[in-house]
Amino acid sequence: MAEERNWKRIKERLPLQLPVRINCRETSDFEWTEVTRLINVTPFGAGFTLKRPTERGRLLHMTIPMPRQLRVYDHVEDQYRIWAIVRYLRGRTTPPASGFEVGVAFIGKRPPESYKSQPWKRYEISNGPFDKLAVLDETWQPGPRDVTDSHTRHNMAVDMRVELVDVNGAIVESEQTVTENISVQGASLFTTLDVSVGRFIRVTSEQYRVTAFAAIRSRTTGADGVPRIHVEFVDRQWPL
């Protein structure tokens, strides 16, 4: 109980710029690691910046030289190795800043069992870091089922440059293509790139003068034999 009272006293965000190692598995066979610094921290979560995209609901593994009085799950090891769920993501667009501001909630020393086979799954916690995780509904049905009152999907060809980055953040593949349909929330794009569900891509339209990051939700092949990827924008809405 005394420890719980101490946590309540320090639940406000503390501006500790500690180094942190972030590991993210986008798919079963692709992961990356980035070293950055915390902006602020509490016993239950932290804020920091990343050069790479992620999204709300994704799980990240963090290694932090965290003061023991701020820890909830481990008070023995020198390094605090903790799993966290992304609760907030905002792109930094004002020069010279770039990348993303990220806010996470710590969830424990081990990930959910489903993470092992499907690391791209997104999760949610209802009230606090001690609540059970629930898998967010990721159903993404391309075509007419995507058309809703709030996010109308327009059957229009928007030019897109699709870029895929490697573990070092360098562009390794790119393709100029068009959308089959698009909404403010996501799009279906024709592609010949062999890119897995769960990966993040960068898309740029000269027509709209817009660059956005997106997560691949599914892949399909149409009746015309042409592959499509169905993506959801993670850092902004598309200006239609």
Give the location of each predicted region.
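Structured alpha-helical
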Residues: 1-240
